[in-house]
From Swiss-Prot:
The keyword Nucleotide-binding applies. The keyword Transferase does not apply. It holds the Pfam family MutS_V. InterPro entries: DNA_mismatch_repair_MutS (IPR005748), DNA_mismatch_repair_MutS-lik_N (IPR007695), DNA_mismatch_repair_MutS/MSH (IPR017261), DNA_mismatch_repair_MutS_C (IPR000432), DNA_mismatch_repair_MutS_clamp (IPR007861), DNA_mismatch_repair_MutS_core (IPR007696), DNA_mismatch_repair_MutS_N (IPR016151), DNA_mismatch_repair_MutS_sf (IPR036187). The gene is mutS. One of its GO terms (biological process) is mismatch repair. Gene3D superfamilies: 1.10.1420.10, 6.10.140.430, DNA repair protein MutS, domain I (3.40.1170.10), MutS, connector domain (3.30.420.110), P-loop containing nucleotide triphosphate hydrolases (3.40.50.300). This is DNA mismatch repair protein MutS. This protein is involved in the repair of mismatches in DNA. It is possible that it carries out the mismatch recognition step. This protein has a weak ATPase activity. GO terms for molecular function: ATP binding; ATP-dependent DNA damage sensor activity; damaged DNA binding; mismatched DNA binding. One of its GO terms (cellular component) is cytosol. Belongs to the DNA mismatch repair MutS family.
Amino acid sequence: MSKSAVSPMMQQYLGIKAQHTDKLVFYRMGDFYEMFFDDAVEAAKLLDITLTTRGQVDGEPVKMAGVPFHAAEQYLARLVKLGKSVAICEQVGEVGAGKGPVERKVVRIVTPGTLTDSALLEDKETNRIVAVSPDKKYIGLAWASLQSGEFKTKLTTVDKLDDELARLQAAEILLPDSKNAPQLQTASGVTRLNAWQFAADAGEKLLTEYFGCQDLRGFGLDGKEHAVAIGAAGALLNYIRLTQNLMPQHLDGLSLETDSQYIGMDAATRRNLEITQTLSGKKSPTLMSTLDLCATHMGSRLLALWLHHPLRNRAHIRARQEAVAALESQYKPLQCRLKNIADIERIAARIAVGNARPRDLASLRDSLFELAQIDLSANGSSLLETLKAVFPENLSTAEQLRQAILPEPSVWLKDGNVINHGFHPELDELRRIQNHGDEFLLDLEAKERERTGLSTLKVEFNRVHGFYIELSKTQAEQAPADYQRRQTLKNAERFITPELKAFEDKVLTAQEQALALEKQLFDGVLKNLQTALPQLQKAAKAAAALDVLSTFSALAKERNFVRPEFADYPVIHIENGRHPVVEQQVRHFTANHTDLDHKHRLMLLTGPNMGGKSTYMRQVALIVLLAHTGCFVPADAATIGPIDQIFTRIGASDDLASNRSTFMVEMSETAYILHHATEQSLVLMDEVGRGTSTFDGLALAHAVAEHLLQKNKSFSLFATHYFELTYLPEAHAAAVNMHLSALEQGQDIVFLHQIQPGPAGKSYGIAVAKLAGLPVRALKSAQKHLNGLENQAAANRPQLDIFSTMPSEKGDEPNVGNFVDKAEEKHFEGILAAALEKLDPDSLTPREALSELYRLKDLCKSVS
């Protein structure tokens, strides 16, 4: 379109939009933010607002949509949650100051990963932005949180990239717009940048300038292998600078993270353990929602961080444990005090980027004074000593804020009444002029009545006409000569005098001057606080850590969590362990033991559907995870050896986006585990092979279990419905059979949820179907077919020798077919043993005993 065909205002808009083609532009016009053309169409659809038109361009109506500026935050929040970025274009010039449209410019860019405004953020979630820079060997990751000042980098590989992004829970991902950019499982929140922005040389130059250092060796970034990490960090820092229109001063150094710091968990494991999100995508009931007794939002965010980053450093874990133990008698008063603490972390972030509001500073002041009053007995905990020593360091900042900010300032700076009385003499004088105007008006009214003798004379004010003297119609003709007529009404006349006009000018000027001076003083306070940011961030981190540690103490005291012990040898020993989430959802929870060590590394878990196998396996993993956060655990006792990773393969569904079936997803997750699990890993495998035919599934389950035993040698909980696998302990001493017990009462079943030695006798599938409400007709049909299949299997057992033709890895190694036969023999022996177990010889009559003998003989025939 030609510029001559559009208005000057539209020319201005198009020029701004050309610089932000990948973003929605909120263009300020009076009391609205307007959007035009395609932006208007998209915004109308996403925000459910009216799409209209304004004028024409090249003969076509210009589509337009808008939102009120005072409600913009709620609309921005919705757009950000949808992964959209928005350029905020404000009026920065005076209306009517010159020819053409009022001057406008983009003052900030709101993106999903660079939010600082509390209205746009979830209180209990950390908002991170991640930059991804690939090369042939490594992928460099850099991530930051503008709310906390976190700034870290790491080297990873393509196969672990999605797991890292799942761990970081990135709100926005920066990728180079190049052919070698990695393909991500998620497409939401992805921002493409020119590939040159990820250049290592440019990144190092920007980073060294920002941190004021000669090189990045002090951050652990040295050598060519770190080039992609440096490039990612540089691209990220530059992106933050561009979106915020300034270089943030609160990023807390740059640290290089390694795999050895935390227990590894892939995306599937985090999902299956439901750490912060249920399998259905809800926030509750999860491990996080169940444990979160934190008094502050900072504490809740740190708790989520600790749960997703279980430590491997035993010294750091023990330091947390000692603090938890020391707080056991102090956590209640501590949490009561912490409830009065504002979100210092996010207030500090808003100070850093220059958009803190008056009440942010008031809340910060009150919180710093409150923290300084925390009095704890460290009881030998060095961590508590360190944390509580931080708070007095901020008293000088709190005192500066007490002097500068009113006890209860206005919400918005533009409304005035923010700076405290006595802070600045000129502001006090301007306020005196405004606040004592009523006295002047009363004095003037009394003086003028006495001078003129006019009884109806009143001195008043309104926003349209300012100050005026009002006389009734009957007395208006007697007005003195120095009264200048200002307005005529039906029953009155309004006048102005030189004295009143001078006062009006003084008051209105004082108001404008006071607002301008308050803004200047407030900006000065914010600027002075920049130097205090490191100490404020330390206080925020210390308060959050105290909050989480006191929460751990509350859990230990109120939910009977115990302090786990750590061993240097391979062991997972748990006495009467409980699932921390499930036990809060049910009236009675059955506790269970777990014993894995160098002799028994794989627990083969069988039992009925709904018997509790998946719950038990998750329970073990969650207890191990919690122990490594420093939290006490739901058990009577626990001893845990070295753990490097936790893997889970529990349940699966079709991945339609990647065109992968349920079975393909299952096999992909299984393959990942077999390739990455080590002797120090904990592996949970549930129903491997169930997504294919019986023989295929059995063969795969056998192979996977054997691989875990012989190659990975991991601690493994292997749940299966293939009873044929219960032979494994005969061939592998490191495997042990355990089962979830159930009790049959007639045609009904009671699940005991108790772990017991040995394999299960049966699966009780039809009994579970009955509990699920299947029609009686269908249940009878199922039972009939089951009986037929069992009889057929018994009559045709040699057919199972199909497996005997399978080559084994070693000549002397038993093959699957032989194990199937042996497993069936054990299964039938179990049936006979169960039948005998039910008999009570002392209570049988001779006739009943003879009848039972014939029944047992028939049973032997059916299983032989």
